[in-house]
């Protein structure tokens, strides 16, 4: 059982957030690192799911809709964490607190707000 969720930032998330979380020892990758820039939100969630990663986003509206669609279709994902657009240090702190208090399997199929 994995303690901390593996993370994937969507393209709207600052690269500094990934750097800060990585410095805390978290397993995180980004859209530019995975060459998935320009993919739709659904494709980003599908990619994160295929990689076993929780998706981090500022895009509340679209990912709330996608989460509901996944649940209605009885599809699985590794979690979605929505974070308000703040400075990168605050965003990283919010995410760090959330993922350090929940085990990876507790995040699966959840839509969470940091």
Indicate residue ranges for each PLM-predicted region.
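Long, hydrophilic "mature protein body" segments
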Residues: 22-24, 32, 50
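Acidic, PIN/NYN-like endoribonuclease modules and their adjacent C-terminal/linker elements
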Residues: 1-11, 15, 20-23, 36, ...
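Conserved BB-loop
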Residues: 27-39
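Short catalytic-loop micro-motif centered on adjacent basic/acidic residues
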Residues: 30-32, 55, 82
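Acidic, metal-binding active-site segment of PIN/NYN-like and related structure-specific nucleases
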Residues: 47-49, 53-66
